[in-house]
């Protein structure tokens, strides 16, 4: 079983955004994390996904300064993203799985961009972190 850890900052105000689209963007990342944690190379008793929200102050998103932003991190302890695809991860048709369509993260990036936000990824074996930053003010 995969353990889901929710670490939410209750002080974050409602985002001026389309909630359903943001849910879709987040679920695309969570789905990938679950698939990575289900791979044969992972000890299935230790798999975990952390959903963490925090306020970020003084953020520059797409060349625009914002006094306040919300940061959503999706962290998993899976095998990591292969180095040969990490730099092109958000482009269409890029997938680390033979059965993957390569569309989920491309859609995520498009949704976050439409909300004037930023999505980034850092990955190594045992620690992959997607970070979504969205303007609040």
Can you say where each PLM-predicted feature lies in the sequence?
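Detector for a conserved hydrophobic position within an alpha-helical segment of the HATPase_c
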Residues: 112-113
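ATP-lid-like helix-loop hinge signature
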Residues: 34-70
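Acidic ATP/Mg2+-coordinating residue in the GHKL
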Residues: 76
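Short conserved segment of the HATPase_c
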Residues: 67-69, 81-93
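Conserved micro-motifs of the catalytic ATP-binding
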Residues: 14-17, 96
């Amino acid at each position: 079983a995969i353990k889901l850890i929710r670490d939410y900052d209750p002080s974050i105000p409602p985002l001026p955004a389309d909630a359903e689209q943001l849910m879709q963007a987040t679920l695309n990342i969570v789905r990938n994390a679950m698939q990575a944690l289900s791979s044969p190379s992972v000890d299935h008793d230790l798999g975990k996904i952390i959903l963490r929200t925090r306020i970020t102050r003084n953020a520059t998103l797409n060349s625009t300064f914002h006094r306040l932003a919300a940061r959503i991190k999706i962290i998993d302890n899976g095998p990591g993203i292969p180095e040969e695809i990490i730099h092109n991860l958000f482009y269409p048709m890029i997938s680390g799985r033979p059965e993957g369509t390569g569309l989920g993260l491309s859609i995520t990036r498009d949704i976050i961009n439409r909300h004037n936000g930023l999505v980034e990824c850092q990955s190594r074996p045992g620690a992959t972190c997607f970070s979504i930053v969205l303007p609040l003010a």
